[in-house]
Swiss-Prot record:
Protein name: ER-bound oxygenase mpaB
Pfam families tied to this protein: MPAB_Lcp_cat
GO CC aspect terms: endoplasmic reticulum membrane
Catalysis: reaction(s): 4-farnesyl-3,5-dihydroxy-6-methylphthalide + AH2 + 2 O2 = (4E,8E)-10-(4,6-dihydroxy-7-methyl-3-oxo-1,3-dihydro-2-benzofuran-5-yl)-4,8-dimethyldeca-4,8-dienoate + acetone + A + H2O + H(+)
Gene name, Swiss-Prot/TrEMBL: mpaB
Species for this entry: Penicillium roqueforti (strain FM164)
Length: 298
């Protein structure tokens, strides 16, 4: 046989192939076409919104992301949170708040002030926090509603900060979790991780919100020299928050008390017969450090 030819290129092969396909049922040809088209269609539709976002907010390089404004960051984060991954953003935010109760200085203050000492006050505290954060993340940074929610939050914190009952590091840690947890949850549980554009938007937005709330990032390695972009801040605050947990997320009875009250809030709409399942799921979502700090069994 010549080097340039084989059975697969001969007329007899073409005739054989046609004969095989001609004898196949029509549904089989349709199924083969569907199997080929389906992944292409899924790829096109799944990434359609991300491609539109990257076209609308054109930051082609990491260097160009340094010019991202707070308003652009807000719009990018809003589209991603409300249209692309709405369920995971909500759950990540809830878990971020829950995770702060693993730090004794935070849980002690909540119990001491009565905010998490009984169901009535724990529901109010959770609702107030959700409302304020919702106003901040769902409205433009230049809007009246965002201004009022920031001002209200600063007022609520001011007395505790003046008396030293709220630590600046605890505030930065809480801010870090609200920025980092959605990124981590989506990377772990969704069909794709966030893009650099989306991560930069989240970092830019929460760094700016922290500044507005009077939460300093100076303790971070680049805090005094400045951050290149939102991704730079996000990565540094993520690393810092993990190191903070190693030092300060330790077992404490009031961590457990705060966690129990928070869990009761989260399971409120679930029928009581399913509460044990909800508790097991909550425990499953915890890593070993958080589980030990809250005195939950493995």
């Amino acid at each position: 046989m010549d080097k340039g030819t084989s059975f697969f290129t001969t007329p007899s092969f073409s005739a054989t192939t046609r004969a095989i396909f001609n004898t196949m049922p029509q549904w089989f040809s349709f199924a083969v076409g569907l199997l080929i088209a389906y992944p292409l269609l899924i790829n096109s539709l799944r990434y359609r919104r991300l491609k539109q976002l990257q076209k609308k907010f054109y930051f082609p390089t990491r260097e160009s992301m340094a010019k991202m404004t707070d308003e652009e960051a807000f719009q990018i984060q809003k589209e991603t949170a409300q249209l692309e991954f709405p369920f995971m953003f909500v759950k990540a935010g809830q878990f971020a708040l829950f995770r702060t109760y693993g730090i004794p200085t935070i849980s002690h203050l909540l119990i001491k002030t009565g905010q998490f000492s009984k169901p009535e006050t724990s529901f109010k505290r959770y609702t107030d926090t959700a409302a304020l954060i919702g106003e901040m993340v769902e409205n433009s940074p230049t809007s009246q509603r965002a201004f009022l929610s920031v001002a209200r939050t600063r007022f609520l914190h001011s007395g505790y900060q003046a008396s030293g009952k709220i630590l600046d590091t605890d505030l930065l840690y809480t801010l870090a979790l609200f920025a980092v947890q959605p990124v981590n949850f989506i990377a772990a549980f969704e069909w794709r991780p966030l893009s650099d554009l989306e991560r930069c938007a989240i970092g830019t937005f929460w760094k700016s919100l922290g500044d507005a709330l009077g939460i300093s990032s100076d303790i971070l390695p680049s805090g005094k020299t400045g951050f290149r972009d939102g991704i730079h801040w996000l990565e540094e605050v993520d690393t810092w928050s993990q190191e903070y947990e190693v030092k300060y997320m330790v077992p404490d009875a009031q961590n457990r008390e705060s966690a129990d009250q928070a869990t009761a809030v989260l399971l409120y709409n679930l029928p009581k017969v399913f509460h044990p399942v909800g508790l097991q799921f909550t425990s499953f979502m915890m890593d070993d450090r958080l589980r030990k700090a809250m005195l939950y069994v493995e």
